[in-house]
Regions:
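Short catalytic/metal-binding and nucleic-acid-binding patches
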Residues: 1-146
Length: 146
């Protein structure tokens, strides 16, 4: 019996410890709306969502090499722009893994997250601005592609 092998969705040959901005989306397992709800196009966080927000904000107080530049907590996923200030010191994969682990421990929900995460290397200011617009408009359900 052959087991399903997950496809690697990362860029080949890319150094994910390189300084710069990374747009990351982390989804809850089975897209369960653990963090709140959308009411009149506004995300209303519940207790879990507020705990997630505190964890994200606290991360900026812990490290000056990794900055959570911009984020939006949705009912069943998180959008976050992570900025690595120093090349070689941190890896996006380990940062996301640490964030997922801390949230899981704090919320005490087994299988809180999907196994993987989505990321996009932000290449320039125009793309950064488009991603911020997408994140801000996400509660409205609009499709926006950069």
């Amino acid at each position: 019996m052959e087991l399903h092998k997950r496809k690697n969705i990362r860029l080949k040959e890319y150094n994910y410890t390189q300084n710069g901005w990374y747009f990351v989306t982390i989804c809850t397992n089975n897209r369960r709306p653990y963090f709140g709800e959308i009411i009149n196009n506004v995300v209303v966080l519940n207790e879990y969502g507020n705990k997630i927000e505190k964890i994200i904000k606290d991360y900026n107080d812990v490290s000056t090499d990794v900055i959570n530049d911009f984020y939006q907590i949705m009912p069943n996923h998180i959008h976050i722009i992570i900025r690595l200030v120093t090349t070689g010191k941190h890896n996006i994969g380990s940062i996301v893994s640490g964030l997922k682990s801390k949230c899981t421990k704090e919320l005490k929900i087994k299988d809180l997250w999907q196994k993987n995460y989505y990321e996009r290397v932000v290449r320039d200011q125009k793309e950064y601005d488009s991603i911020v617009k997408y994140i801000v408009e996400n509660p409205f359900g609009d499709k926006y592609y950069w």
